[in-house]
Structures are given as C-alpha cells and as structure tokens.
Amino acid sequence: MLIYQDVLTGDEMISDAFPIKEIGDIAYEVDCANIIIKEGDVDIGGNPSAEEAAEALEEGAQQVNNVVHSFRLQSTSFDKKSYLTYLKGYMKAIKSKLQESNPDRVAAFEKGAQDFAKKIVANFKDYEFYIGESMNPDGMVCLLNYREDGVTPYFTMWKDGLKEIKI
C-alpha cells in the first residue's frame, strides 16, 4: 500500500486505496465518495454502495467525504485573491524542494503548474478547500470538486507536493 504525504508538512493526504488518476504530469485526481458514519463505526477503507447515500441518516450518524474522514483533512476557505497569494508561496516552496531532490523536474513543474493554475482560477467558484490534519498553512491545499454529474466528488492534489511512502 502507498500513502502519499505532503512534502512540506508530512501530513498524510491520500493512499492508493482510492482511485488515483494522474492529470498532465502535474496533478492527481482522487475519486472519493460521501459515506455515512455512525458513532463508534470504524472505517476500514471499504467502498460503500452508491445507494447507501440515499438512505435517511440515523440518529448519531453523519454524512462525510471518505477521503476527508480517513485522512482527517480540515476544511478551509479562500477568496480568489488569497488563494492566488497562497499558491504563489506554495509553488515557490515546492520548486525549492524539487531543486534539492529532483532538479531535472523543475522546468516541467514550472510549466505544468502555471498551466494548471490557470484552470483552477478559471473554475475557482467550483472548489472546496481542504488542508492536512496538522492545519499547517504552508502545506498543500487540496481542491474538492464534483464530476459533471454534480454528485460524484473528487480531489485534485499537486503531484510534486506529495511523496510516496510504501507501507
């Protein structure tokens, strides 16, 4: 099993237990689902059926995103200006990390990140924002959006902001 950690904070952000698709060698899209948890339930990474979401919530139960719940991601908020300020600093930090660990990747990262950031800004209103469990403001901000059906959630995460840990 692979766990993906934020390279800046060490927070666990995702694992390969969730479907992960690489987007343009710059980001990952991670499919997720809204699940119902009850007080005392233990989530072992199973993927509940889609019909379960339609059931009424029992007392003490709540509907949560399985990635947010499994990795204890914390909701945060941005307006466009503050997100762009954050993103500029984050990209600089990731570039610095890449220069230490993988200097050959820097040029591709800069080009890909610039293009991908334009897509994010163009669809800014569609995103919800999450940060790692430590709530470190310097870490990665994961972007939650919904597929064209308006129901299926997915996260977008910067590929170079994650490191694989084999467990």
UniProtKB/Swiss-Prot annotation:
Residues annotated as domain TCTP: 1-167
Sorted UniProt keywords: Cytoplasm, Cytoskeleton, Microtubule, Protein biosynthesis
Compartmental location: Cytoplasm, Cytoskeleton
Gene Ontology terms: cellular component: cytoplasm; microtubule
Single GO biological process annotation from the record: translation
SUPFAM superfamilies documented for this protein: Mss4-like
Family listed: Belongs to the TCTP family.
Name this polypeptide is given: Translationally-controlled tumor protein homolog
Taxonomic source organism: Cryptococcus neoformans var. neoformans serotype D (strain JEC21 / ATCC MYA-565) (Filobasidiella neoformans)
